A protein has these predicted regions:
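Catalytic-core regions of core metabolic enzymes
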Residues: 1-251
C-alpha cells in the first residue's frame, strides 16, 4: 500500500516511521496533495548534528511543496471540537475551552490525564516537538483567534525568536489569558530541556521578564499550569487593574 493508492482526499497524515524514511514519505504526501502532517517520528535535531541535517532536509521538502507539519519528535495533536485525536497514546479528554501547547509530549499527556481525572475540559492540545516548521508562537496565534478557546496553557522549554514570541503573546493576551510554565529553572533542568528537543533554553530570569512584559501569567509547577488556566476558562476578562483584596488574616 502507498499514499498514492488512497482513493479519497486526505486532509492530514500522521507519520511515525523511522527518521531516515521521512523525506520520501513527505514527498509522497505532497504528491498526493495532503496539506498537513503530524510528524511523530524522532531521531532528528534532538540527537545531534546528523539529525539536524536530516531535519533541515525534511523542512526544505515540506516548505517547497507547500506542506505544513508539526514536529518532528512530537506526541501529536488533539482537537475535541473537531473530534480528532492524532497522538501516540489512547487518551480522550472531555471537550472544553482550554488550549494546551506543550514542548514536552510526556508532560502534555500528564496534564491531560490530570484534566480528565479532575473533570476539566480540554478543547485543543498541540505537542510542538522540535518545532522545525510550526512554532509554539504560531499555535498561540492560532488559538488566539479561535472563539472556542477561552484560555491557553503553555509549557515552554525554549523559543528560537524571543521578539516574535513576544509580539504574538502581547496580541493574544489582550483578548484572552495565557498561562506559562517555563522549564530550566536549575542548571540541570536547562540542560535536560535542551537535550530533549534541541531548543535553546535561555535564562530563566529572562523568560520571566519576557512573560511579565507580554502579559503572560507565569506559574511554577505543572499542576498550577492546569489549575490556573482551567479556572480562567470560566472567568471573565478583567476590565481594568482596579482590584482590591480583603483578608481576615495578616499572614
Amino acid at each position: 500500500p502507498t499514499v498514492a493508492a488512497i482513493p479519497e482526499t486526505v486532509d492530514l497524515a500522521v507519520i511515525t516511521i523511522p527518521a531516515a524514511h521521512v523525506p520520501q514519505a513527505l514527498q509522497d504526501c505532497i504528491a498526493k496533495g495532503i496539506p498537513s502532517v503530524v510528524l511523530i517520528s524522532s531521531g532528528f535535531r534532538e540527537t545531534g548534528a546528523e539529525g539536524a541535517v536530516l531535519e533541515a532536509e525534511v523542512t526544505r521538502i515540506a516548505t517547497a511543496g507547500g506542506l505544513t507539519y508539526i514536529g518532528p519528535n512530537t506526541m501529536g495533536i488533539i482537537s475535541t471540537h473537531g473530534h480528532l485525536t492524532a497522538i501516540g497514546v489512547p487518551i480522550f479528554p472531555n471537550p472544553g475551552a482550554l488550549a494546551i501547547i506543550s514542548q514536552s509530549g510526556n508532560l502534555g499527556m500528564q496534564i491531560i490525564q490530570w484534566a480528565i481525572h479532575r473533570g476539566m475540559g480540554v478543547g485543543f492540545y498541540a505537542g510542538t516537538g522540535n518545532e522545525a516548521q510550526l512554532k509554539a508562537r504560531d499555535l498561540l496565534a492560532y488559538f488566539g483567534t479561535r472563539p472556542e478557546v477561552k484560555a491557553v496553557a503553555l509549557y515552554l522549554e525554549g523559543v528560537d525568536n524571543g521578539r516574535a514570541f513576544m509580539e504574538t503573546a502581547r496580541a493574544v493576551t489582550r483578548t484572552k489569558p495565557v498561562v506559562a510554565l517555563k522549564t530550566g529553572r536549575s542548571a540541570t533542568g536547562s540542560k535536560a530541556a535542551q537535550s530533549h528537543s534541541g531548543s535553546m533554553a535561555g535564562s530563566y530570569a529572562t523568560y520571566s521578564a519576557m512573560f511579565k512584559q507580554a502579559g503572560i501569567i507565569q506559574v511554577s509547577t505543572p499542576s498550577e499550569l492546569l489549575n490556573v488556566s482551567a479556572a480562567l476558562t470560566h472567568l471573565p476578562i478583567p476590565r481594568s487593574n482596579r482590584v482590591g483584596i480583603m483578608s481576615l488574616g495578616g499572614g
